[in-house]
C-alpha cells in the first residue's frame, strides 16, 4: 500500500463524516443560497472542525464563489477542497539538520506518545539516521519499560534512569551518549502533566537549559502528541501545552479509528501550530509525514466516488469505476483462494502435534471414558 493509500484509508471515517455528509447535502440543492451555507457550516461544526474554523471556511467559500461566478452547487466540493488545502499549508517539515539534533516529545497519558516515539525512531533510522532515545518521562509508571520495548523494536539505544529520577539528568546523559556515539538525532520522552502546569513548565525549562548548555545552536523540535479521537478536547490540550511549552509541531495519532480527523483544521487555523506527522494505523510505518495536499485529497476523495461528474468526463469515470471493481473482484477472489489454502493446511498441522502434546499427560487411553467420580474414588483408595 502506497503512502497516499495509507492516508486515504486512515481518513476513511473522517471522510465519511465530513465530506461524505457535505456531498450528500450539496447534491440535494439545485442552487447556491444562504440555506446551503448554513447547512454546510452546521455539518462542519458536527465534523469537529470547530465553530470559528467552520465560519472561516464558509466565508472563504462565499468569497470564492462570488469571484468565480459559480452557480452550480456540484462545483462547491472542489472549491471547499482548495480552501482546506490552503488552510493546511505550513511549516510541516521536521528540522533536524544539525548533528546531533534533538526532539522533545510531550503529551498527556494515553495519546500514543511512547508509540509515536518508537515509530518516529524507526522511520528516522530507515532514512539512514542514527537515533538514540532518552527516557525522560520518569514520572509516569511503566513509561520507561514501554519505551524500552519500542527501542528494542526500532533497534536503537535507550538511555534511562530509575523511576522518579530528574528528567533533566536523563536528557544530559542522553546528550553525552549521543556525542560519544556520534548520533544524528536524539528523541526524548517527557512527562505531560497538564494538571500541574507549573511543574511541567519548570521541568521543560530545566531540560531546555541543559540543551542550551550542552548543544548550543542545535536544531530542536518540541512535538505535542494529540489523540484525534478526542476531537475538540485535543484543541484544548494543544492550547494548554502551547502556553506552557514552546511547541514547534503536532503529531496527530489514531486518525484511522475516529471520524474526528477534522480537528486538524482548528489546530492549524486557530492555534497556528503545524502538523508534522499523522498516525493512520498500528503498524510501525503507519506514522506518516503530514502532507497538506495529500491530506486534502484523501479527505475529499469521496467527491470522485459519489459526487456527480460533468458529461465529458462521465465515460472516463465509468471506465475507471469498472476497472476498480474488476481489481476489487480479483483481489477478493485471490484472498478467498488464499484463505481456502490456509484452511486446508493448518488442520493437519494442528492435528499432528496434538497427540504428541496430550500423550504424556493422558497416558491411559481410556481416560476420556472415565466417570467423573472415578478420580475421587481413586484418591480415596490412595489415601
Residue ranges and their predicted role:
Residues 1-22, 26, 363-383:
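Polybasic, Ser/Thr-rich amphipathic helices
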Residues 9, 13-136, 143-163, 169-179, ...:
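Primarily NTPase-proximal linker/entry elements flanking Walker-type ATP/GTP-binding cores
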Residues 87-91, 214, 306:
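Solvent-exposed amphipathic alpha-helical surface segments
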Residues 111-118, 141-143, 233-235, 258-262:
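Short glycine/serine/threonine-rich phosphate/pyrophosphate-binding segments
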Residues 51-53, 140, 256, 284:
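Short hydrophobic/aromatic residue motifs in ordered secondary structure
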Residues 167-181, 195-304:
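Conserved catalytic-core segment of NTP-binding enzymes
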Amino acid at each position: 500500500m502506497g503512502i497516499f493509500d495509507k492516508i486515504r484509508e486512515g481518513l476513511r471515517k473522517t471522510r465519511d463524516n465530513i465530506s461524505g455528509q457535505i456531498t450528500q447535502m450539496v447534491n440535494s440543492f439545485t442552487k447556491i443560497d444562504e440555506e446551503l451555507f448554513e447547512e454546510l457550516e452546521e455539518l462542519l461544526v458536527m465534523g469537529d472542525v470547530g465553530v470559528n474554523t467552520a465560519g472561516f471556511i464558509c466565508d472563504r467559500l462565499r468569497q470564492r464563489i462570488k469571484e468565480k461566478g459559480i452557480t452550480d452547487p456540484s462545483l462547491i466540493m472542489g472549491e471547499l477542497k482548495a480552501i482546506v488545502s490552503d488552510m493546511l499549508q505550513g511549516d510541516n517539515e521536521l528540522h533536524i539538520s544539525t548533528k546531533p539534533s534533538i526532539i522533545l516529545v510531550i503529551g498527556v497519558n494515553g495519546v500514543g506518545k511512547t508509540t509515536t516515539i518508537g515509530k518516529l525512531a524507526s522511520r528516522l533510522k530507515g532514512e539512514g539516521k542514527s537515533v538514540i532515545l532518552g527516557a525522560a518521562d520518569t514520572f509516569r509508571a511503566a513509561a520507561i519499560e514501554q519505551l524500552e520495548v519500542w527501542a528494542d523494536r526500532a533497534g536503537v539505544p535507550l538511555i534511562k534512569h530509575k523511576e522518579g529520577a530528574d528528567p533533566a539528568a536523563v536528557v544530559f546523559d542522553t546528550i553525552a551518549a549521543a556525542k560519544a556515539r556520534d548520533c544524528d538525532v536524539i528523541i526524548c520522552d517527557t512527562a505531560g502533566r497538564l494538571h500541574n502546569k507549573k511543574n511541567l513548565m519548570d521541568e521543560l525549562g530545566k531540560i531546555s537549559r541543559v540543551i542550551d548548555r550542552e548543544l548550543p545552536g542545535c536544531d530542536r523540535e518540541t512535538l505535542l502528541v494529540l489523540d484525534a479521537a478526542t476531537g475538540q478536547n485535543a484543541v484544548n490540550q494543544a492550547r494548554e501545552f502551547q502556553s506552557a511549552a514552546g511547541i514547534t509541531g503536532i503529531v496527530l495519532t489514531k486518525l484511522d479509528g475516529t471520524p474526528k480527523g477534522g480537528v486538524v483544521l482548528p489546530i492549524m487555523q486557530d492555534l497556528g501550530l503545524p502538523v508534522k506527522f499523522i498516525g493512520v494505523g498500528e503498524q510501525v510505518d503507519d506514522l506518516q509525514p503530514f502532507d497538506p495536499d495529500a491530506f486534502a485529497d484523501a479527505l475529499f476523495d469521496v467527491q470522485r466516488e459519489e459526487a456527480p461528474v460533468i458529461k465529458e468526463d462521465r465515460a472516463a469515470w465509468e471506465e475507471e469505476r469498472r476497472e476498480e471493481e474488476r481489481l476489487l473482484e480479483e483481489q477478493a477472489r485471490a484472498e478467498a483462494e488464499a484463505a481456502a489454502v490456509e484452511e486446508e493446511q493448518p488442520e493437519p498441522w494442528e492435528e499432528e502435534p496434538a497427540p504428541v502434546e496430550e500423550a504424556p499427560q493422558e497416558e491411559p487411553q481410556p481416560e476420556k471414558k472415565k466417570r467423573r467420580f472415578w478420580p475421587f474414588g481413586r484418591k480415596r483408595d490412595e489415601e
